[in-house]
From Swiss-Prot:
SMART domains: RL11 (SM00649). The keyword DNA damage does not apply. This is Large ribosomal subunit protein uL11. The lineage of its organism: Bacteria, Bacillati, Bacillota, Clostridia, Eubacteriales. The gene is rplK. It holds the Pfam family Ribosomal_L11.
């Protein structure tokens, strides 16, 4: 028989740096999950992605066990890393803060493809380019 799901928790955590401190502790604690067990497992699986924010979906079962699925980092985080900037523009339509190439957009789109509801790499690239524009990043040919 399948385990009964009692909760789904969605968090965005820095890769390899999950700790029982907020926001992890309170979110997992209210469902009775072993917080240290989750932190150790998450940190082990994300150790090679240091510096990125990793979204994670944790499924909590009735017997207090859990499983989790790692998603790809948000497009904005990948774009900031590719452009080498700390944050996007406050006024993206007026102030442009950086430039990225089509090749960088393609690379990010290929990374994000499993989590995007895009049929082809071209549509995924246009989604990523839209995110870049809304952050004040210019896309060059």
């Amino acid at each position: 028989m399948a385990k009964k799901v009692v909760g789904m928790i969605k968090l965005q955590l820095p890769a390899g740096k999950a700790s029982p401190a907020p926001p992890v502790g309170p979110a997992l604690g209210q469902h009775g999950v072993n917080i240290m067990g989750f932190c150790k497992e998450f940190n082990a699986k994300t150790a090679n992605q240091a510096g990125l924010i990793i979204p994670v979906v944790i499924t909590v079962y009735q017997d207090r066990s859990f499983s989790f699925i790692l998603k790809t980092p948000p497009a904005a985080v990948l774009l900031k890393k590719a452009a080498g900037i700390e944050s996007g523009s406050g006024v993206p339509n007026k102030t442009k803060v950086a430039k990225v190439t089509k090749d960088q957009i393609r690379e990010i789109a290929e990374t994000k493809m499993p989590d995007l509801n895009a049929g082809s790499i071209e549509t995924a690239m246009s989604m990523i380019a839209g995110t870049a524009r809304s952050m004040g990043i210019t896309v060059e040919e």
